[in-house]
UniProtKB/Swiss-Prot annotation:
Induction and repression of expression: By wounding and methyl jasmonate (MeJa). Down-regulated by salicylic acid (SA).
GO molecular function: monocarboxylic acid transmembrane transporter activity
Gene Ontology biological process: glucosinolate biosynthetic process; glucosinolate biosynthetic process from homomethionine; response to jasmonic acid; response to wounding
Membrane topology of the entry: Multi-pass membrane protein
Domain of life per record: Eukaryota
Protein localization: Membrane; Plastid, Chloroplast envelope
Protein family membership: Belongs to the bile acid:sodium symporter (BASS) (TC 2.A.28) family.
Tissue: Widely expressed.
Protein name as catalogued: Probable sodium/metabolite cotransporter BASS5, chloroplastic
Gene Ontology cellular-component annotations: chloroplast envelope; membrane; plastid
Residue ranges crossing the lipid bilayer per the database entry: 101-121, 122-142, 162-184, 191-213, 222-242, 252-272, 286-306, 317-337, 379-399
Disruption phenotype: No visible phenotype under normal growth conditions, but plants contain reduced levels of aliphatic glucosinolates.
Function: Plastidic transporter involved in the biosynthesis of aliphatic glucosinolates by translocating the biosynthetic intermediates of Met-derived glucosinolates across chloroplast membranes. Transports short chain (C2) alpha-keto acids, such as 4-methylsulfanyl-2-oxobutanoic acid, from the cytosol to the chloroplast where they are subjected to chain elongation cycles. Also functions in the transport of chain-elongated (C3 to C8) Met derivatives from the chloroplast to the cytosol. Does not seem to be involved in the transport of indole-derived glucosinolates.
Amino acid sequence: MGVISPTETLFLKSQHRLLQPRNYSYALAFHSTRRVANFPRNSFSSLGSCSVDFPLRSNPISQNSKSIHPWRRYVSESDSNELYHKKVSSIMETLKQAYSFIPHGILLSTILALVYPPSFTWFKPRYFVPGLGFMMFAVGINSNERDFLEALKRPDAIFAGYIGQYLIKPLLGYIFGVIAVSLFNLPTSIGAGIMLVSCVSGAQLSNYTTFLTDPSLAALSIVMTSISTATAVLVTPMLSLLLIGKKLPVDVFGMISSILQVVITPIAAGLLLNRLFPRLSNAIKPFLPALTVIDMSCCIGAPLALNIDSILSPFGATILFLVITFHLLAFVAGYFFTGFFFSKAPDVKALQRTISYETGMQSSLLALALATKFFQDPLVGVPPAISTVVMSLMGVSLVTIWKNRKE
């Protein structure tokens, strides 16, 4: 019988304890499967050291965990939190980029209104004011008081916008009204309707299109439209008398109420929210683009659906052609008129786009209301009804074109 070495003696004395070793508090990794490993029986060498036949890796664990595999909860919570934040960031970024879907929304609403008018007939004219007001709120919440103070320091640009709205556009309206009657043999009431569109104030939608293209000039656009709307109580009746031969009284209190509801109140609300509750304002901003796309789609699809009979009338195609050409030339005239007189301005391109919107987009809804109230012939209201849709689609299309060129 050989002599037992000290190491073997230690092993024999300790064998009853080594058969069932205790679990260690750190985790061991076996390939891709993570587990807390017990040491096997024959895991000791002749030197008494611990050895295993697979790679070991320690992982951080939760100290207060009651689970036999606490690292599992740690890893799953960490991964799930990271995944959650990534999803939230992705959703927020998509919402912020919703403005890029405006052309798709407009096209979809136009097709729906033509194919199935009841899809938009629920959006009655009484909803137009709050609908436009919501767009102005989106402009206000993304602006500040300094923008409007800077806009008031540019009286020459404001005057140029006024000339575009009440000189260039009425001149084009008169020309196209005469062309409609003399060259296309359309009824006189159709020509009067085209002229009526050119006599009204600028459209509030022009403020929003300017905001999408050149946010720094949105306040200037708002000032231009507000001044043209405020003075429409005097200018529109005079222009209608000069061009159509009929003086149309405009409701002064109605115009003031319209400015307050559509422009001043929502913009002031947005500015105040920015100033007094910045955290709430920042929480709301990511959702506004998507909501505005839906709002704008309704404001454009509804007039088309509500006036579908006029648009599909025997004169509809000819009137559509005339109205498209009329607005197109107005956009072009406003653009080059501004470029000629403000060629040395540092922001001449942005200013050209802004005044182009102001010249090309008139308040066709106001023209439609005047035609319905003061003219017995319903055909007078056909050009304003078509103009509402055409003007909006052309303005939004220009937003897409100009934004892509800027980028």
